[in-house]
Amino acid sequence: MYATDSRGHSPAFLQPQNGNSRHPSGYVPGKVVPLRPPPPPKSQASAKFTSIRREDRATFAFSPEEQQAQRESQKQKRHKNTFICFAITSFSFFIALAIILGISSKYAPDENCPDQNPRLRNWDPGQDSAKQVVIKEGDMLRLTSDATVHSIVIQDGGLLVFGDNKDGSRNITLRTHYILIQDGGALHIGAEKCRYKSKATITLYGKSDEGESMPTFGKKFIGVEAGGTLELHGARKASWTLLARTLNSSGLPFGSYTFEKDFSRGLNVRVIDQDTAKILESERFDTHEYRNESRRLQEFLRFQDPGRIVAIAVGDSAAKSLLQGTIQMIQERLGSELIQGLGYRQAWALVGVIDGGSTSCNESVRNYENHSSGGKALAQREFYTVDGQKFSVTAYSEWIEGVSLSGFRVEVVDGVKLNLLDDVSSWKPGDQIVVASTDYSMYQAEEFTLLPCSECSHFQVKVKETPQFLHMGEIIDGVDMRAEVGILTRNIVIQGEVEDSCYAENQCQFFDYDTFGGHIMIMKNFTSVHLSYVELKHMGQQQMGRYPVHFHLCGDVDYKGGYRHATFVDGLSIHHSFSRCITVHGTNGLLIKDTIGFDTLGHCFFLEDGIEQRNTLFHNLGLLTKPGTLLPTDRNNSMCTTMRDKVFGNYIPVPATDCMAVSTFWIAHPNNNLINNAAAGSQDAGIWYLFHKEPTGESSGLQLLAKPELTPLGIFYNNRVHSNFKAGLFIDKGVKTTNSSAADPREYLCLDNSARFRPHQDANPEKPRVAALIDRLIAFKNNDNGAWVRGGDIIVQNSAFADNGIGLTFASDGSFPSDEGSSQEVSESLFVGESRNYGFQGGQNKYVGTGGIDQKPRTLPRNRTFPIRGFQIYDGPIHLTRSTFKKYVPTPDRYSSAIGFLMKNSWQITPRNNISLVKFGPHVSLNVFFGKPGPWFEDCEMDGDKNSIFHDIDGSVTGYKDAYVGRMDNYLIRHPSCVNVSKWNAVICSGTYAQVYVQTWSTQNLSMTITRDEYPSNPMVLRGINQKAAFPQYQPVVMLEKGYTIHWNGPAPRTTFLYLVNFNKNDWIRVGLCYPSNTSFQVTFGYLQRQNGSLSKIEEYEPVHSLEELQRKQSERKFYFDSSTGLLFLYLKAKSHRHGHSYCSSQGCERVKIQAATDSKDISNCMAKAYPQYYRKPSVVKRMPAMLTGLCQGCGTRQVVFTSDPHKSYLPVQFQSPDKAETQRGDPSVISVNGTDFTFRSAGVLLLVVDPCSVPFRLTEKTVFPLADVSRIEEYLKTGIPPRSIVLLSTRGEIKQLNISHLLVPLGLAKPAHLYDKGSTIFLGFSGNFKPSWTKLFTSPAGQGLGVLEQFIPLQLDEYGCPRATTVRRRDLELLKQASKAH
């Protein structure tokens, strides 16, 4: 692996094949092999050290026998000595060998570790901010201590490696203005197979207005030029996971409690639930003035349940009327020893436990002498909730300068414990983590510091700070709303050194802090770049090209680019960034994996020029993405209108259409892969796919082989988007690709509405369409849209939308879909209007109101009056099928509907929009709503509003099979048998429907009135699209086989086009257009090819002399002009077949052109003359079907739960716990397991035991314990529950004493719970050595029920001790592998 040049120097690495190549083909970029010195040459043995003592020996004469005996004796001695010598030598050899092996194992270098290269020389440059270091050929340096230098350039085989220790005890900080890695240079901190163990920090320092700026790279950077190597590999950590249990505000289920008041005379008392820390009662007893108050306190304490926590604090004075009986009650029930001697205005505080004795009581007293008396009587005790959270209760009473104060606090102590989905044993005390918002505002994301936690499992951590907001850790209503939790700390840190506040020309009008951080920039033809488990903090600058990680015009960086080891970034933590997270600029084939981008300015994961392809983003988390200044799409409202130096003239940008698009994932080309990512909070969008008409920026002028608009979508699988303001997922629009000019004064790269996504095979519009697949999207708590999707063929499947302003909107185009024949479909999906995630006020959540289902307070999207919709119909054609809707209930403030329509819609909606196999839950009051005049809907008079319609194929929406649903006041689609649904503002009709596309020339501000002959009193007035343009257009939906007349509010158009839209062969309508009586006509027919604008098969219409003749010849090209009424009649009848979802026929769009010649400028409204002459009695063309009865078979999604870990199985469990009145009414108590109901109607306890290792589920035991025999449950819980079991318990009726608290501790509770005199008790537990996060206890006061509770229990976890099943299929990993192969 190493080669020596002619001068005897050894370069650190051999060059790769790509770039400036000097490496042989066997080189693997990034692998580090230390250079071993050659063994010493073998030399001739030096002189043998023979030390033979020459001794004079005496000679003796022996007889032959004696000589023989002596020889035998000597021989035996020699054998014995030889054996002894051999044994000693062998023993010494093995001892020496063991020592050598021990030493070598301890000191031999690991060839995978760059810092163990024996050719490295220790380097300690010291602290010299003026030193400009150049590491060149022959320089192989190991940094061993802190250093400050001006700059470092590594070139021509130079190598810089950070020293490390096996025990990770080194802590090295290198401060420098920049590090430039040039051809042949390399910087290593750890390696993939030998991760860095110590702490390494590179601090990039310098101010924007000081010092020189380097060409290309600028200031404060790590730059990699062609031939350079950058390998940074920190210790592995679980990058991010999800909460497995809800993290409550203040760390307690009902929050913390703080109270303080002056002169609150008497004894102030709080009763606290010992299991939940909830304040149960708050009372004041004026025992100073009134003896009755003393008696009331005595009775109050008498009826408290044993075990309750009681806190008491004196306000002002409490002793004067305090009766002895009350004193004794306090002594007996709370164990007080100081109450007996309580005197005038003495400050006294107590925290005790009812019937807990003196050992449970903590109290304090301070004497009062005069107004100058001071001192605080403070009592405090610590407790645990049943979930194991430690909390304290504090009571205090004091005098301060003559003012009496008393107060209470209930708060967590010693940190808050978090339960997490994955093993986080790699997270250590002192690490920083972030927990994402699970509400509408991304600003509810919170940072925490980890504390030591000896009692925590591998799935738990303890945090120092107290949570301010609620963070969900549950699957709610079948939707995974568990908050993401990311680790920000890494042991390799690259950070920008920043000033205390903004300065110089750093956009200080928008930011009050320094935004001039460091940056990493990688150029084309680098040798090797791999970054893993590195923390980047205060990186990026509000300047173009200066980002935390920036792959700049690198081309192909995988195998296609000649890299045997494809380039990746893995496990990075990029936080508090000043410009983006990772920029992929003119770069293809990059893998971005397990990376966190938190608190950034501008688009976070950013694909820049619209040419970036084949990049894979796998399991990344982005949150708190804020506006920046670089591009118009980064900017917010104020930035957009203030930054006008690049617009033309005096143009003022329009924020909503030019800017305001900042996104966590900005995907500028569809041929990229997104798998398992989370966009958990952006000012505008979570994931935004946009489509460049041509390459932009530094890629401008490059010729793309395929247009992004036409390119099939890469892999989109299992991504989640929430807490975004504009949209979770947005597929639409592009950017302006021309400079500002008088013709278009908008800024270059501002948001543009010209692009239309229409994917085709090989990006060739002449080849078949390729449907873009959005598979497994979870979108919740997005203020506006969960997803807005515009394009050609797009399929959304296996997805869930909850608590969004609008769940999902499909859009195509205003008149005709750009991609002829395309359609959009959503299937196997779930829509939830108002879930049990009620949210939490604060963190810029602006709106709070009352929920429609249970009237509980909840945070709201957009506005308190905003109409919530699950699926929004727009344009078309769309198909909604096999989907379920839950919890859409209006309130007095707002409408809420499962299905709705785009409000204030001026464009077309096709009657080919269709719905089938949908299911509506019991809490859906409005299946459909067409809007009504009022807030948000305004006057509901736009053309699209009036023509809203869809086809209910199977009756699953309306109960009428093969029916169409339109707005109630639309008489173009009605017949006498139609059914009105007033609360929907809808009408349900049978029939066949199509559209007429009417276009006129040179008729600005002209409104069209269309009237059906059967309903002349109910015309429809259409304002037209683009009223001020030269070619306004109108597109009403019409019932086929009917007659219509068309009128105008101004002079009749001289040129009018009528297009038959969505007509099948032989479909027809008759139209009569109003003209002055002296008008002459030229009417022609032709097929228009919309792709190229050509016209074919042109035919002339000929006049006939009567309407009767026209009716007889309706299949011919004829027209009839009735000059008495001014109506030009003709039949619009389709001659050709229409295929699939095409708006037009297979021959082209059938079009009639009317050229009118008249000198009249009168208003052309013929209504008064046309009717009643042409009135027809309303009739039914297609019989109205009978209303369906019974349940819709096979309707709704087959999936019960939608999670971000779809490879796991979850068991849905639902409890129905009625209250006393409901019980007396006969309502059952129910435990439902995976849809199977277990019902009981008699007072007692139902207990189910479920096998946690079986899917879907296996019930192993069902036992009912009647009230009369309820004590048997104690023995059953002791001996009857088998190991490795899920335990589900529910009570019915009031059971005064259920002595099983201590028996629930082994099943998951942290301590015995208070179960006396409860209305209902519900418990989920686990019998085994593992304590899952889902074990829970719910109780309600006497007479009250718990309503409906739903839990989703994971099955087949290794921690349960389940037998190893076959390998779980991981679709995400299969797709990742597929994406890598596609590279």
UniProtKB/Swiss-Prot annotation:
Its main location: membrane. It catalyses: Random hydrolysis of (1->4)-linkages between N-acetyl-beta-D-glucosamine and D-glucuronate residues in hyaluronate. Induction: Up-regulated in by proinflammatory cytokines in normal human dermal fibroblasts (NHDF). It comes from the Eukaryota. Residues 1-82 are cytoplasmic. Residues 1-50 are annotated as: Disordered. The modification Phosphoserine is found at S10, S63. SUPFAM superfamilies: Pectin lyase-like. The keyword Transmembrane applies. Residues 104-1383 are extracellular. Residues 121-245 form the G8 domain. GO terms for biological process: angiogenesis; hyaluronan catabolic process; regulation of sprouting angiogenesis. PbH1 repeats lie at residues 669-691, 711-733, 791-812. Glycans are attached at N248, N292, N914, N1234. The chain crosses the membrane at residues 83-103. Its EC number is 3.2.1.35. Belongs to the CEMIP family. PANTHER family: CELL SURFACE HYALURONIDASE (PTHR15535:SF26), TRANSMEMBRANE PROTEIN 2-RELATED (PTHR15535). Cell surface hyaluronidase that mediates the initial cleavage of extracellular high-molecular-weight hyaluronan into intermediate-size hyaluronan of approximately 10-5 kDa fragments. Very specific to hyaluronan; not able to cleave chondroitin sulfate or dermatan sulfate. Has an essential function in systemic hyaluronan catabolism and turnover and regulates cell adhesion and migration via hyaluronan degradation at focal adhesion sites. Acts as a regulator of angiogenesis and heart morphogenesis by mediating degradation of extracellular hyaluronan, thereby regulating VEGF signaling. This is Cell surface hyaluronidase CEMIP2. It comes from Homo sapiens (Human).
